[in-house]
From Swiss-Prot:
It comes from Calamus usitatus (Palm tree). RuBisCO catalyzes two reactions: the carboxylation of D-ribulose 1,5-bisphosphate, the primary event in carbon dioxide fixation, as well as the oxidative fragmentation of the pentose substrate in the photorespiration process. Both reactions occur simultaneously and in competition at the same active site. Its cofactor is Mg(2+). It catalyses: 2 (2R)-3-phosphoglycerate + 2 H(+) = D-ribulose 1,5-bisphosphate + CO2 + H2O; D-ribulose 1,5-bisphosphate + O2 = 2-phosphoglycolate + (2R)-3-phosphoglycerate + 2 H(+). The modification N6,N6,N6-trimethyllysine is found at K14. The keyword Transferase does not apply. This is Ribulose bisphosphate carboxylase large chain. Heterohexadecamer of 8 large chains and 8 small chains; disulfide-linked. The disulfide link is formed within the large subunit homodimers. GO terms for molecular function: magnesium ion binding; monooxygenase activity; ribulose-bisphosphate carboxylase activity. The active site is at K175 (proton acceptor), H294 (proton acceptor).
Length: 467
């Protein structure tokens, strides 16, 4: 090959490695309404400038690679590349920054949470230039959110299906979650539902084990809820966990639940995967099933404060993938800051339009347009003394789930359910009469316990429990 030919072939392409910030750090960029925006908490390695770290995140989660490649010339990087458009220091933290990245909409497949996460967080978290990386929030543009079905039914449709209005819903996880036979499990479900609960629940790891195969559990639970419905005159439900080792098996279980005529099924959306969850959500809408979502494995992803993903991102992803309920923490007994953060992502689940509010961890204004909302589920260590606070904090559009707070009643499951229902009805009535639940909550519970021996017994058992 002649020197002249070599020169012509190399025009516009220079091999080698160059700083990411030269291409992917664009502080003058004005974001578009169609961009997906991300807020990353970045902890660079020593000696790596924050601009280079932010640009590296934008590059490695979009079009970039570690070296210049000649095929860059075959496309428009300006059209497809992610851009780090702003960086701010995290107050009170050493060497931590919030890097804001804008992604063009064309980088993502329509209606696929799987593809969105594969692009944004699929590879960049192992990047050497970063000591730690956490995705704090995403802004999903309406042009992208409208490509998703979202929750199978949403809050209003669920209330209409259940014919329950004006109060939070009550639930209970059956315990022990592993080891019961299907018939004994169904008996526990029946006792809770006839006592006044709206729902009972399979726990996250109740699938189809040797001691209780899924089909037997489904049959006995269906018998229990129909019997409880006949006795109480109320519509009842049990979250039948359809999570399985394959999508085909998961769908088989959901189809059987529909054939039984039950109102709701359940899925572990993180361990089951977003593709499986979206498929199940579509089936549930088409076939009139509500879908309860458990967040098993979430703490593996969201517990570290400087690495992983915040739960608000997982909550947004669930609303897009599809689910009518999702566990979201209790707030009760937590620090005020954690309370505000929790209520921030609760609003992201329920509301149509959420304003940016950094004090609540909301980095971007989010407009869900007409996508149905998701009911947050409060569960974990709660009992009748928490009922006023839970009613005030979460409001009517919530599920308050008392596991041990029902099954731990000294008189049994049904009296435990009665105690919770009486406590809830007392709190709702007091609120509607204008009383202050935060200030008068304990007095409201004491007043109700005077005419409910079940509630009085529960109050005595858990009076010294503090969370």
């Amino acid at each position: 090959m002649s020197p002249q030919t070599e020169t012509k072939a190399s025009v516009g392409f220079k091999a080698g490695v160059k700083d990411y910030k030269l291409t992917y750090y664009t502080p003058d960029y004005e974001t578009k309404d169609t961009d997906i925006l991300a807020a990353f908490r970045v902890t660079p390695q020593p000696g790596v400038p924050p601009e280079e770290a932010g640009a590296a995140v934008a590059a490695e989660s979009s079009t970039g690679t570690w070296t210049t490649v000649w095929t860059d010339g075959l496309t428009s990087l300006d059209r497809y590349k992610g851009r780090c458009y702003h960086i701010e220091t995290v107050i009170g933290e050493e060497n931590q920054y919030i890097a804001y990245v804008a992604y063009p909409l064309d980088l993502f497949e329509e209606g696929s949470v799987t593809n969105m996460f594969t692009s944004i967080v699929g590879n960049v978290f192992g990047f050497k230039a970063l000591r730690a990386l956490r995705l704090e929030d995403l802004r999903i543009p309406t042009s992208y959110s409208k490509t998703f079905q979202g929750p199978p039914h949403g809050i209003q449709v669920e209330r209409d299906k259940l014919n329950k209005y004006g109060r939070p819903l009550l639930g209970c996880t059956i315990k022990p979650k592993l080891g019961l036979s299907a018939k004994n499990y169904g008996r526990a479900v029946y006792e809770c539902l006839r006592g006044g609960l709206d729902f009972t629940k399979d726990d996250e790891n109740v699938n189809s084990q040797p001691f209780m195969r899924w089909r037997d559990r489904f049959l006995f639970c269906a018998e229990a809820l129909y019997k409880a419905q006949a006795e109480t005159g109320e519509i009842k439900g049990h979250y039948l966990n359809a999570t399985a080792g394959t999508c085909e098996e998961m769908m088989k279980r959901a189809i059987f639940a529909r054939e039984l005529g039950v109102p709701i099924v359940m899925h572990d959306y993180l361990t089951g995967g977003f593709t499986a969850n979206t498929s199940l959500a579509h089936y549930c809408r088409d076939n009139g099933l509500l879908l309860h979502i458990h967040r098993a494995m979430h703490a593996v992803i969201d517990r570290q404060k400087n690495h992983g993903m915040h739960f608000r991102v997982l909550a947004k992803a669930l609303r897009m993938s599809g689910g009518d309920h999702i566990h979201g923490g209790t707030v009760v007994g937590k620090l005020e800051g954690e309370r505000e953060m929790t209520l921030g992502f609760v609003d992201l689940l329920r509301d149509d339009f959420i304003e940016k509010d950094r004090s609540r961890g909301i980095f971007f204004t989010q407009d869900w347009v007409s996508m149905p909302g998701v009911i947050p589920v409060a569960s974990g260590g709660i009992h009748v003394w928490h009922m006023p606070a839970l009613t005030e904090i979460f409001g009517d559009d919530s599920v308050l789930q008392f596991g041990g707070g029902t099954l731990g009643h000294p008189w049994g499951n049904a009296p435990g359910a009665v105690a919770n229902r009486v406590a809830l009805e007392a709190c709702v009535q007091a609120r509607n009469e204008g009383r202050d639940l935060a200030r008068e909550g304990n007095e409201i519970i004491r007043e109700a316990s005077k005419w409910s021996p079940e509630l009085a017994s529960a109050c005595e058992v858990w009076k010294a429990i503090k969370f």
